Design a protein with these regions (language model features):
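Extended alpha-helical interaction scaffolds
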Residues: 81-99, 103-107, 113, 121, ...
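Second RecA-like catalytic domain
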Residues: 1-236, 296
Length: 296
């Protein structure tokens, strides 16, 4: 019946529902197949599904920070999970299970959460295999990994204020990068964060540098385009305008020159007649145009 068909899952929805993580995280894994980074996406999304396995006891903050700093990536906290995962895999192969538990304790890692992380990864890996999604064996590029993650974090992007260590996020939210982040000391111009946590202020946790150019292709359903200064350009032989592209109010493209004919054909026709035909401001080989100029 009609109601049942309204609730039918799309092919993407059907795949999302099979992955054992939140749909937002599942979306990242599915996007990752286009970017050759399924392995990294599974490691990161399974880590984001659980409480952070890295512990930071109140009385051992400095010691635990030093242990965890080994895994930091100066541009991405998401890649710190990949570094940690690779380290744990190597250690687990080399050590007995008791020695591995002890290692987790001395590295300020919660053993049970590490196991939970590995379990979710294994489940993800199984479903991905059943869906026929190939898993990369070579490490993926930074850009590819973060574009895949971006599909699930579009409402968590931010642009740095020029003179402050603060970011403007979606719908004008203001947040700062969490002090535990590898990006805290040198915050980049644009970031995405895994979550926004409100304590004394709004903090962005698990952050990474992004290029605003990556946002537009994966955010088509959220994009707003505005146009200004439509004007005739002799060299282009067309009406051009300045396009601004925003997502949740953030200017991912501040000013791009575009052909205006598809946007407002009536105005373009009017400007063409006035500038090209009446004023003769046109570079063309059309015979009628040369004849027109002779009549002036």
């Amino acid at each position: 019946d009609e109601q049942a068909s309204a609730y039918k899952l799309t092919p993407l929805g059907r795949q999302l529902s099979q992955l054992p993580v939140d749909p937002r995280l599942a979306r990242m894994v599915l996007e990752a197949q286009k970017h050759g980074c399924v392995r990294e996406a599974m490691i990161i999304t399974s880590a984001l599904s659980i409480q952070d396995p890295r512990e930071r006891p109140m009385d051992k903050q400095q010691a635990s920070d030093e242990k965890h700093r080994r895994f930091h990536d100066k541009e991405s906290d998401f890649l710190a999970f990949v570094n940690l995962w690779n380290y744990l895999g190597e250690q687990q192969k080399a050590l007995s299970s008791n020695a591995f538990r002890r290692l987790c304790r001395t590295d300020y890692l919660n053993y049970l959460r590490v196991r939970e992380w590995q379990d979710i990864y294994t489940q993800l890996r199984q479903v991905v295999k059943e869906l026929g999604i190939p898993v990369n064996s070579e490490p993926a590029e930074y850009r590819e990994i973060h574009i895949a993650l971006l599909t699930g974090l579009l409402s968590h992007i931010g642009m740095k204020d020029a003179d402050k260590q603060e970011y403007t996020g979606a719908r004008n939210a203001r947040f700062s990068i969490f002090p535990g982040s590898g990006l805290f000391k040198k915050p980049p111009k644009w970031v995405m964060v895994a979550e926004l946590v409100e304590t004394s202020r709004l903090w962005g946790r698990i952050a990474a540098r992004i290029d605003p150019e990556w946002v537009e292709p994966v955010a088509q359903h959220l994009i707003k385009r505005t146009y200004s200064e439509p004007h005739w350009e002799r060299a282009q032989g067309a009406v051009m305008a300045t396009e601004k592209v925003t997502v949740y109010g953030l200017p991912i493209v501040a000013a791009r020159k575009v052909n205006y004919s598809q946007i407002d054909p009536a105005l373009c026709r009017e400007l063409f007649i006035r500038h090209a035909l009446v004023e003769g401001d046109w570079q063309t080989r059309h015979a009628f145009f040369r004849e027109n100029l002779k009549l002036r």
